[in-house]
């Protein structure tokens, strides 16, 4: 197992936990900025050097900007590099070796926002749709050559992104949110079944069906939800 994080201490701590839980497992940690293609390639190269190959690449990093049209060009570029380009960097780094042996798996953390939308954050909604689009393309293009792809698409997950580092943040997705452990368990099941969409909140599938069945009705419903959220939580409501 290779553990990567922008925070070197955080990556090392997770690696230590993995090693304690599975003493026979080979583990290493490496600080990586996933927005940096060379850094992602370096991670893949080091994992390949240590382990011989990369079987599964879990592309998990993501950020949110609670902005709409006021988001600057720099804001858009930053979230694009992390929420979209990180997945592309991962594919570029390990797809060649996967294709050579005819087997490999990309597990990309995306969001239900990539299937639906995100009230309160235009950059998040747009980049998560793009992340789904890239994963679909990857599966369509290489699925018959042994490459498997899964997208994890939860709604609220009980992490610092949702609650803030000190639990100070309030938002409509906190109700009904699930633990990271729940997401992990559902993800393991989804990967075992080789499902493209992994939905820790099963109701998201029904929301997605309704969107496809009657887009205009879905948009009207989302506008009502938007108004309700803004009244209850104000402008920063994610």
Question: Model-found features: residue ranges?
Answer:
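Active-site helix of classical SDR
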Residues: 91, 127
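Residue(s) in the substrate-gating loop at a strand-loop-helix junction
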Residues: 111
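Conserved glycine-rich Rossmann-like NAD(P)H-binding loop of the short-chain dehydrogenase/reductase
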Residues: 1-13
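The beta1-alpha1 cofactor-binding region of Rossmann-like NAD(H)/NADP(H)-dependent oxidoreductases
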Residues: 8-9, 31-42, 73
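Conserved mid-core segment of classical short-chain dehydrogenase/reductases
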Residues: 63-77, 120-123
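SDR active-site lid
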Residues: 140-203
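A glycine-rich helix->loop->beta "capping" turn
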Residues: 21-26, 46-57, 65
């Amino acid at each position: 197992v290779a553990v990567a994080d922008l925070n070197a201490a955080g990556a090392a701590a997770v690696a230590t936990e993995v090693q304690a839980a599975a003493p026979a497992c080979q583990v290493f940690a490496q600080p990586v900025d996933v927005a940096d293609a060379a850094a992602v390639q370096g991670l893949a190269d080091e994992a390949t050097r240590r382990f011989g190959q990369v079987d599964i690449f879990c592309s998990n990093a993501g950020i949110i900007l609670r902005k709409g049209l006021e988001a600057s060009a720099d804001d858009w570029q930053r979230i694009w590099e992390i929420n979209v380009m990180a997945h592309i960097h991962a594919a570029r780094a390990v797809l060649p070796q996967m294709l050579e042996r005819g087997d490999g798996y990309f597990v990309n953390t995306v969001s239900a926002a990539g299937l639906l939308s995100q009230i309160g954050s235009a950059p998040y909604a747009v980049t998560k749709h793009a992340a789904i689009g890239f994963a679909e393309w990857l599966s369509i293009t290489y699925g018959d050559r042994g490459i498997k792809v899964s997208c994890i698409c939860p709604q609220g997950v009980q992490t610092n992104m949702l609650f803030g580092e000190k639990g100070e943040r309030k938002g409509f997705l906190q109700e009904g949110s699930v633990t990271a452990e729940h997401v992990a368990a559902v993800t393991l099941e989804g990967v075992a079944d080789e499902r493209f969409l992994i939905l820790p909140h099963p109701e998201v599938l029904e929301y997605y069906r309704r969107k496809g069945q009657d887009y205009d009705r879905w948009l009207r419903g989302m506008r009502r939800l938007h108004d309700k959220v803004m009244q209850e939580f104000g402008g920063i409501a994610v």
